[in-house]
Amino acid sequence: MTAPALALDDLCKRFGRIHAVEHLSLEVPSGQMVGFLGPNGAGKSTTLYMIPRLVHPSSGRIRIFGVDLRRDFKLALRSVGVMVEAPAFYEYLSGRKNLQLAARLLGRVTRRDIDETLDRIGLADRQHDKVRTYSQGMKQRLGIGRAVLGKPRLLILDEPTNGMDPEGTREILGFLQHRVRNDGLTVFISSHLLHEVEEYCDTVFVINKGRLVASGHVRDILRPHERIVRTTFAGEVPDPETLRADERIKHVESIAPDTLDIVLAADDSAWLNQHLLQAGFRVSAISPRQKTLKEFFLSITGDHRNA
């Protein structure tokens, strides 16, 4: 049986009386792009910092491709690339020179590797400019390039697209997805961009208050037990409060003057249609709609700041 790319076993971190991470256990499957989500202060960054030992766990175990960090730290991290928060560089040197310095430390990077990396992260035209002239988004690109330079098997990224415009975000996530599909790279990525996580990630883990609250394949966790039915009316629209009085209807949200999103406790849009017709409402369109990752995230964390 193949070992997971990353395994956290009963991981805890306490800062005095603050329990930042509480008994967190998860396994990141190899060869996937995996999202790591949670509200602000949920423990995401603390967890990511513990993997390369930038922060030491209070208790628990971390294994990378089956290697326990406590037993062989260097071997475990040999196959890992990391970018957490805002990456730091030698600002007075060029982007290319910064990658060359990183390549010397890694010891297994060719000039061609640097050329290809600069091209794929979209900095080929600015590679000879000093980093101090780069925007935040460009520095994020360079940080990702440095993290993948040594051809790691596991890449750990904390908010990697901060400061990037939508086009740049798609370009970088597409680059990472290409590496996953073609090179077998595993990417463990923390991000507040839920739409992009839904589009690019295979699996997601959601933590809240330092604990794991949901996990699974994106398709599976968005296949809800309750269904959202978008319903358009010809004429009078029912009062949401009146609809919510029926226990089979869990939530009602007005989307447009003639349209409601109705959340059912069970997958039964046919019942809803009949129920509305019997109540005297004319339905012009009705269609079940799957939850988005944003809606799923809000339903289990209640956090609207990160939506």
Task: Walk through the language-model features, giving the residues of each.
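Short, charged/small-residue-rich alpha-helical element at the C-terminal edge
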Residues: 227-300, 307
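ABC transporter nucleotide-binding domains
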Residues: 3-6, 13-189, 194-208, 214
